[in-house]
């Protein structure tokens, strides 16, 4: 452990003493190297960002970042615990002391991973993307209310804890204060946003932009979450603008004229209809998500939704809770930016001339802060004049190019995500109390197990939609779709089998008609006697005797077959009349004619429906694809059995009635009722079912499910 610490300290210059151990590289921020380490004082893993102070520009950036992150306190913003100097020394609240150091360390909240690393595995589900987008907008609403522009929003700067699906905005190294009451035109740095997430206005006017540039970057990130790839990935700024114009309509004529003066080659007379609209770039998203994205990715920043307006869009209504979307109570103003620049200039002037004026009676804290500086000189951002452009600093993300054998993240979650509204650090020499304050303070109302958020959902939707269980919701929807497909397949196969039954019935009817025609021909006794006399008068040869014997045998077989068929039909007729006598005189004639004529058909249908029942039962046992399928199938069976409670005294009678509905019995009952044509039939089902039971075969009776039915409507409901 000590050797590893010494190696990292020698290579990267990390000098924090023995308090922080187990250092692991995470990547580079906007202006510094980031490591993770374990704080031995409280046994917590934290993220530590080192900022090297080499020139006035780096000092200014550090002053700006520290001032911003110390005041921002939100559930969707990475928390900052401490600002340390070399060897882990404590720094005072006076930011002017930074000018005396060569490096500074920002100890902040450790997050498990970032969105860029998550998207390397592929696109997200739309529910997950919507949840992360809501948290991003929630954080942006707070940041913009504090008059701060992030200016470097990209997936690598959005950190995620996968355990609770909390997203937080980090890396404010390129953020700056923008007071809306003052004009910053011409005094803003160029090209700070990563090229792929730059808005069209930022490409046209690099020194003139507003908070809308963060919203454009947020829209590009949302599209990237849905597709798994960058929405507009241009190789250079000209190609970037071309890709945007191919998909984003230019509605206003003044915007088209400005484009015509800059890149006339790519400008058409009608720019309202793009060649490749967002519907083609994002073919799989919902209509609500597409409408939401089209209102964010607008060419004109004046038409673009703000963070607050985006949270009020119907697409975000599932999570939106305005009372739990706070804004800054202490926003920045132009004075904060002016004071930092003046302090930096005065302090550096004091340092550079310290050897000449070492006997000066004024101490560092007694130096005057306010002078009569020209406002244009104050608003000028020296970052635009640096040798290394900010674009190059932002574009390179070393986190993605770390060696594979290095550990990037720690499995254990670092901290709870809640924090107090205003930090109150009573002991500046130690920050262990800040961890306790972090863990014991209020929690975000839209997080897991948050009662205000859940109460709001109950009040609004009358049911709780837990945002942290999207996978279960999707599994349920998939199960419903699979169940629907299975039911469609089962219905189709059953229809095909019913077609086979009808074919078999038609074949049996044809054979019966043929047999009846043969029986209808009868036996001509006179012809037989005449033939016999004629044969007896002739010489009886062996051939004639054989023919006579054949004729006698055929006649005897024909008579035997006729007797058997008559006995079978008479037996069925008597059996059917005896059973149907219980229906009463109202339905005697119609039921008798239908039942007697369909005696053999009833037996065939009963036997076939029994086989269908067995096949469907076996198919149902083999088609479970998930535990949800089996669980809900069992639940439906149990609910069906519990619909009719059985009393102790009537258990035997209802048990007998339950056996009446076999696979063939159900089909037979519905067919006979339809053929009779008596929709006004409302008598108890017990007696006709007992009569029909006698006509069912034993095999069909054995395979019938034991489900009690007491009314005709319940039978039809079960059949359907």
Curated annotation (Swiss-Prot):
PROSITE patterns documented for this protein: PROTEIN_KINASE_ATP (PS00107), PROTEIN_KINASE_DOM (PS50011), PROTEIN_KINASE_ST (PS00108)
Q: Which gene encodes it?
A: Mapk6
- Function, as annotated: Atypical MAPK protein. Phosphorylates microtubule-associated protein 2 (MAP2) and MAPKAPK5. The precise role of the complex formed with MAPKAPK5 is still unclear, but the complex follows a complex set of phosphorylation events: upon interaction with atypical MAPKAPK5, ERK3/MAPK6 is phosphorylated at Ser-189 and then mediates phosphorylation and activation of MAPKAPK5, which in turn phosphorylates ERK3/MAPK6. May promote entry in the cell cycle.
A GO term for molecular function: protein serine kinase activity
Query: Quick one: a GO cellular component term?
Result: septin cytoskeleton
- List-wise, which residues carry Phosphoserine? 189, 386, 554, 556, 683
The Protein kinase domain is annotated at: 20-316
**Spans of biased composition, class Basic and acidic residues?**
647-657
The reaction(s) annotated as catalysed by this protein in its Swiss-Prot or TrEMBL entry are: L-seryl-[protein] + ATP = O-phospho-L-seryl-[protein] + ADP + H(+); L-threonyl-[protein] + ATP = O-phospho-L-threonyl-[protein] + ADP + H(+)
What Pfam families would the database entry show? Pkinase
Q: What are its GO biological-process terms?
A: positive regulation of dendritic spine development; protein phosphorylation
Q: What is the protein's name according to its record?
A: Mitogen-activated protein kinase 6
Listed CDD domains:
STKc_MAPK4_6
Originating species: Mus musculus
Show the segment(s) annotated as Disordered: 638-657, 700-720
């Amino acid at each position: 452990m000590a050797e590893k610490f010494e190696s990292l300290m020698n290579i990267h210059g990390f000098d924090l003493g023995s308090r922080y151990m187990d250092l692991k590289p995470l990547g580079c921020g906007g202006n510094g190297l980031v490591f993770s380490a374990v704080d031995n004082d409280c046994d917590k893993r934290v993220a530590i960002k080192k900022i090297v102070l080499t020139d006035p520009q780096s000092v200014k950036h550090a002053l700006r970042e520290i001032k911003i992150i110390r005041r921002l306190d939100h559930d969707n913003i990475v928390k900052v615990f401490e600002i340390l100097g070399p060897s882990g020394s404590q720094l005072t609240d006076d930011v002017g002391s930074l000018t005396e150091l060569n490096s500074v360390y920002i100890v902040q909240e450790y997050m498990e991973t970032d969105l860029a690393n998550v998207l390397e595995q592929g696109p997200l589900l739309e529910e997950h993307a919507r949840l992360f987008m809501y948290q991003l907008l929630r954080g942006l609403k707070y940041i913009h209310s504090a008059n701060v522009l992030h200016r470097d929003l990209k997936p690598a700067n959005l950190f995620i804890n996968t355990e609770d699906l909390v997203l937080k905005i980090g890396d404010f190294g390129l953020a700056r204060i923008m007071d809306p009451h003052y004009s910053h035109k011409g005094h803003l740095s160029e090209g700070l946003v990563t090229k792929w997430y730059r808005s069209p206005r930022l490409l046209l006017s690099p020194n003139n932009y507003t908070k809308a540039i963060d919203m454009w970057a947020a829209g590009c990130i949302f599209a990237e979450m849905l597709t798994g790839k960058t929405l507009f990935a241009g190789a250079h700024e000209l190609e970037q603008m071309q890709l945007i114009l191919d998909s984003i309509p230019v509605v206003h004529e003044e915007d088209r004229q400005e484009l015509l003066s800059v890149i006339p080659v790519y400008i058409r007379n009608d720019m309202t209809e793009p060649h490749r609209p967002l519907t083609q770039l994002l073919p799989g998203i919902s209509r609500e998500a597409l409408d939401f994205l089209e209102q964010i990715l607008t060419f004109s920043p004046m038409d673009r939704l703000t963070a607050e307006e985006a949270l009020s869009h119907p697409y975000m209504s599932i999570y939106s809770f305005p009372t739990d979307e706070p804004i800054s109570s202490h926003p920045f103003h132009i004075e904060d930016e002016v004071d930092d620049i003046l302090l930096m200039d005065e302090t550096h002037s004091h340092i550079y001339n310290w050897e000449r004026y070492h006997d000066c009676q004024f101490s560092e804290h007694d130096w005057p802060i306010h002078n009569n500086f020209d406002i244009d000189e104050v608003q000028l951002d020296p970052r635009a004049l640096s040798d290394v452009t900010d674009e190059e600093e932002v574009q390179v993300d070393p986190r993605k190019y770390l060696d594979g054998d290095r550990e990037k993240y720690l499995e254990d979650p670092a901290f709870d995500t809640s924090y107090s509204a205003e930090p109150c650090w009573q002991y500046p020499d130690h920050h262990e109390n800040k961890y306790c304050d972090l863990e014991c303070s209020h929690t975000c109302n839209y997080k897991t197990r948050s009662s205000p958020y859940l109460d709001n959902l109950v009040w609004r939707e009358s049911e709780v939609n837990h945002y942290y269980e999207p996978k279960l919701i999707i599994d349920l929807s998939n199960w419903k779709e699979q169940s629907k497909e299975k039911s469609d397949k089962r219905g189709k196969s059953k229809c095909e089998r019913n077609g086979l039954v009808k074919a078999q019935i038609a074949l049996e009817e044809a054979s019966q008609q043929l047999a009846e025609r043969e029986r209808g021909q009868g036996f001509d006794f006179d012809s037989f006697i005449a033939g016999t006399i004629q044969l007896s008068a002739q010489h009886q040869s062996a051939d004639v005797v054989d023919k006579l014997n054949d004729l006698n045998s055929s006649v005897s077989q024909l008579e035997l077959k006729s007797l058997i068929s008559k006995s079978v039909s008479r037996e069925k007729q008597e059996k059917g009349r005896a059973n149907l006598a219980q229906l009463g005189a109202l339905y005697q004639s119609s039921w008798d004619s239908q039942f007697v004529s369909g005696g053999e058909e009833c037996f065939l249908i009963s036997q076939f429906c029994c086989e269908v029942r067995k096949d469907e039962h076996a198919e149902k046992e083999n088609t479970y694809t998930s535990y949800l399928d089996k669980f809900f199938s069992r639940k439906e069976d149990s609910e069906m059995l519990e619909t009719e409670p059985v009393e102790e005294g009537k258990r035997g009678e209802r048990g007998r009635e339950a056996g009446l509905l076999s696979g063939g019995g159900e089909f037979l009952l519905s067919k006979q009722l339809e053929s009779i044509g008596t929709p006004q039939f409302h008598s108890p089902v017990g007696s006709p079912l007992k009569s029909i039971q006698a006509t069912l075969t034993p095999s069909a009776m054995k395979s019938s499910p034991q489900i009690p039915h007491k009314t005709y409507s319940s039978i039809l409901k079960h059949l359907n």
